Amino acid sequence: MHFRTVNTPARLQFISRFVLQPLRPLLHYKDHTIRTAAEAGLDVAELAVGPAFVVARGYFTLRQADTSSAESRDPTKQQQLWEKTLEWLGMTEEQGAL
């Protein structure tokens, strides 16, 4: 067995290759948004710089405008996330203002 050099533990590489990959068609049938990192990365790049998305803003699923979860739109949760982010970065509210 020859894995590429990555910082992923060997056990996790094994599970990914021999358990998750064979089950991928089944997982995709259950949830059509399940994709590889490479596939998702192409969408992110297209959304970031693609001509079709120059004026696009918001939340997207598979390059289609979508509504994010109710939890992500909750102002209290947003504030908690912002405060935790500042804490983890060791920043103050003043340093975090955009």
Swiss-Prot record:
Biochemical pathway: Secondary metabolite biosynthesis
Keywords: Oxidoreductase
UniProt GO MF annotations: oxidoreductase activity
EC number of this enzyme: 1.-.-.-
Top-level enzyme category: oxidoreductase
Protein's job: Dehydrogenase; part of the gene cluster that mediates the biosynthesis of aculins. The pathway begins with the synthesis of 6-methylsalicylic acid by the polyketide synthase (PKS) acuA via condensation of acetate and malonate units. The 6-methylsalicylic acid decarboxylase acuB then catalyzes the decarboxylation of 6-methylsalicylic acid to yield m-cresol (also known as 3-methylphenol). These first reactions occur in the cytosol.
Protein name: Dehydrogenase acuH
Source organism: Aspergillus aculeatus (strain ATCC 16872 / CBS 172.66 / WB 5094)
Gene: acuH
